[in-house]
């Protein structure tokens, strides 16, 4: 049997109710997350249905396996508001994430940096080298010659 820690966010307008998000973390994660290695990965991706975005954060076990810290489906595009909801949920259930020894690797997209600075100010945000290179190629147009 698997137990989930779950929050459902409803956006309520007069006369109707609209599901705007679902955030999950498995119950055993409360005991496991404090013992994971101190490097976590976080990312978001657009979903194939509706205008929802999938948010996720994973840690690494001692055996180098990925372990799900938290996951969420939130209505709308990836933005600071969505990351704020996600990180507040993750921090509520895993307060050990807000520690100066924690490094969170992200892709520096759409509000994640500002959200981490506001909600997990002690954690260190490090940018993924793959995405860093993609940004250099796209925005600076560098990296196309031998010594650029």
Predicted stretch roles:
Residues 1-148:
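DNA-binding interface regions
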